[in-house]
Amino acid sequence: MDDNLSGEEEDYYYSSDQESLNGIDNDESVSIPVSSRSNTVKVITKESLLAAQREDLRRVMELLSVKEHHARTLLIHYRWDVEKLFAVLVEKGKDSLFSGAGVTLLENQSCDSSVSGSSSMMSCDICVEDVPGYQLTRMDCGHSFCNNCWTGHFTVKINEGQSKRIICMAHKCNAICDEDVVRALVSKSQPDLAEKFDRFLLESYIEDNKMVKWCPSTPHCGNAIRVEDDELCEVECSCGLQFCFSCSSQAHSPCSCVMWELWRKKCFDESETVNWITVHTKPCPKCHKPVEKNGGCNLVTCLCRQSFCWLCGEATGRDHTWARISGHSCGRFQEDKEKQMERAKRDLKRYMHYHNRYKAHIDSSKLEAKLSNNISKKVSISEKRELQLKDFSWATNGLHRLFRSRRVLSYSYPFAFYMFGDELFKDEMSSEEREIKQNLFEDQQQQLEANVEKLSKFLEEPFDQFADDKVMQIRIQVINLSVAVDTLCENMYECIENDLLGSLQLGIHNITPYRSNGIERASDFYSSQNSKEAVGQSSDCGWTSRLDQALESGKSEDTSCSSGKRARIDESYRNSQTTLLDLNLPAEAIERK
């Protein structure tokens, strides 16, 4: 124990050990609270889905002075991107905005969609029958048809899954039908279909919105997640599931989404099984089934009773001596087969190298998850002892830092497998450049791995049984290592983003930025709305005055909003307490089966 705690023998990767000790007497120096700024990730439940949708509808309705179904049509067309909708309005004008989305507004339009309140007979251009005027319905585009034809048209479109954009029946008319009219006509004959129509419109806020996605939990929790800033992020739903918002897979940074999808398939499909069969077996020349040699003799007999030479794979007779095999002599060296076999062996060995280390850290994470209860017990016992040290938050902070850094370390191996292999970037880097980058990355990875293991070791120490001096030494080591692994994780991400992926021509391999506080937990949408109303801040980000000027002048305006995304409202978190780091275990450790 004393050897492990010797400061002279430990060589931690940190720019200045003394700097990390300056605040030792104050545990706030290592307590890493969740950021006090407004939460940028919201969880939308079934109850708050309608409120979330109405928030965007209200903004468009107020700024454009249009009905709700017109605002919905515009938002669906622009995938519920309010800022993009406003930008098109400023750049191209109101007419272009409406025509592109299929919205038609008639001057002096009556609120009543019926053609006439009288019983005078009028002809329907679809069924070519004369019906009373009150049985004809006119849409915003001015086209009118009988209610039976409209109802049949709406029924077909809803059943075909086109509820979000039901266009007028008139020839070459692309106007979107009024959802109130659709609902009113369909509900008279098929109330269930009307409910289906409303459900499609409601879920459009999630299905068509790139900033909102369903939680991929199984069984489904019923929640959706909305992000305010960048869709390239990792989030945690209120149900506890952590996932990548970009691809809806488990959180996998520093792997890109493409890398993780390839790795996941490689681990679960039969690709490596095929490699093993290629390396360790040979096909029978008669039945073509793979045969594994279980002895030293090169004359092999398949279950189908066919004998063949193990060296070249050619069929032979069954008799042989030490000098020759009956009916066979090996031919010339076949270079292609040998190269193929050697390549398969090399690829299998390389895959097993990265997979074994990835799996080892995943297994370590599962074992370290049990440390949470042990740490709590040791802290509880230590607080009851008469020790000089009264605050043991350093142990909890160190445990959370261990979980976070172990997750990063686990997924760094799949990243390295594809980054320095031939599958993705063979033509992007020369062999010399690949070697330099690989050495740079592996140095970072090795330093992180060494410090993570040291941190894990010190947290497992029974400090609840030690005297004051040893507890203080463990505390210093845990604090130093917590700072060190956080710095190393940040450096690794910077290395990946700038030195590795940043120099490549392909821009599809983006990674989620490193968050020292861990994966962001989604806050409730209702609470954020209440906070917004309490603060009384506008979420229009300056668009209102600019749009008024654009609509009045009718000219395009080259301006930009101070926020490229939805505006955020700062919250004080007055009723919340300062919390510690997120308990970010690898997804395998928290995956619901």
From Swiss-Prot:
Positions of Zn(2+) 2 binding: 141, 143, 168, 173
Binding site for Zn(2+) 5: 284, 287, 302, 304
Organism phylogeny: Eukaryota, Viridiplantae, Streptophyta, Embryophyta, Tracheophyta
Gene: ARI2
Source domain of life: Eukaryota
Pathway: Protein modification; protein ubiquitination
Catalytic activity: [E2 ubiquitin-conjugating enzyme]-S-ubiquitinyl-L-cysteine + [acceptor protein]-L-lysine = [E2 ubiquitin-conjugating enzyme]-L-cysteine + [acceptor protein]-N(6)-ubiquitinyl-L-lysine
CDD domains in alphabetical order: BRcat_RBR_ANKIB1, Rcat_RBR_ARI1-like, RING-HC_RBR_TRIAD1
Keywords: Metal-binding, Repeat, Transferase, Ubl conjugation pathway, Zinc, Zinc-finger
Organism, scientific name: Arabidopsis thaliana (Mouse-ear cress)
Family label: Belongs to the RBR family. Ariadne subfamily.
Residue intervals of every IBR-type zinc finger in the record: 195-257
Record flagged with keyword Zinc-finger: yes
Name of the molecule in the record: Probable E3 ubiquitin-protein ligase ARI2
Zinc finger (RING-type): 124-173, 284-312
